[in-house]
Amino acid sequence: MNDDRIILDNVSRFYGEVLGVNGVTLSIPPGVTSLVGPNGSGKTTLMNLITGLVRPSRGRISVLGVEPSQPQRLFRFVGYSTQFDAFPKGLTGSQFIYCFLRFSGRPAAECRKLTTRAIEQVGLVEAADRKVAAYSKGMRQRIRLAQAIAPDPRVLILDEPLNGLDPLVRSETIALFKRYAAEGRHVVVSSHVLHEVDMISDRVVLMSGGYVVAEGPIRGVRSEIQEERPMQFLVRCRQPNLLASRAFELDHVVEARLLPDSEGVLVKTRDADAFCRALNHLALAGIDIEGVVPADDNVHSVYAYLIGSEEATK
């Protein structure tokens, strides 16, 4: 069924001779999906294609069964927040949301209700009647998010939505995304801050130079490259020397290194599932294992493995 997915089929977009994105094929299910990559990797172009702000040079796009070339249909269920910090002059936060809703043809009473709810959801009730021009950077980011969620959309497309938010508001915003995902909606966000993506996402789309280099659940992507890049596990135990010795007996383990504090072992393996099963047997055999933590199944590590550590830190 494609009517509950965002579909891109061999989509490319060129700006003259400049590549925006090339050959992108994706099938995005409900949930939180993060587009990840440094500036210039194609994240914003991909969002503009999904929302119909730019047309593909080739390929086909469908958003829950609707083509982006049909904006009147598309924006009945799509909310989009760009990263551009521009607002109409003279409007308060409430007026900004209300006018946006009225322009979409909704009755005034419904617009007032939706405006109030959206402003409550982003925590701007006390600032609702202040001019947007007097807002801080973080408050302007939140009022843009309020505009996107005000129509109660089934699909949210958000370009760098956490940029400029303080830690408390960032946490509340992430909780809002997860709540939308739990309701079966799509939340597509872009980010170049990789540690945030681990907190937000069900799935990731890793981009570089206009190409999709990997996509899927982050741990699934990590598992796919474990033969080339063995997975790392941090194992805390009271007998690290014995554990390291036993780990080296496993044919899929390529390294077992004692930690500097001598209270654990860092193990690299080409078969994570087999290693976890082996740990269970070692524990039953008497090795006192206190904890096991994957050391490199996060977005930053995977992106660095696929693209290079220099790109991953941009």
Provide a role label for each language-model segment.
Residues D3-I6, R13-G209, V213-A214:
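ABC transporter nucleotide-binding domains
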Residues M1-S12, S309-K314:
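ABC-family P-loop ATPase nucleotide-binding domain
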Residues F14, G90, F233-R236, K268, ...:
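Active-site-adjacent beta-strand anchor residues
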Residues R13, E255-L258, P294:
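Hydrophobic/anchoring residues in structured secondary elements
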Residues P71, V197, L243-A244, F275-C276, ...:
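Short, well-ordered alpha-helical microsegments
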Residues R270-K314:
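C-terminal coupling/interaction segments
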Residues F75, I119, R222, Y303-A304:
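Conserved protein kinase catalytic domain
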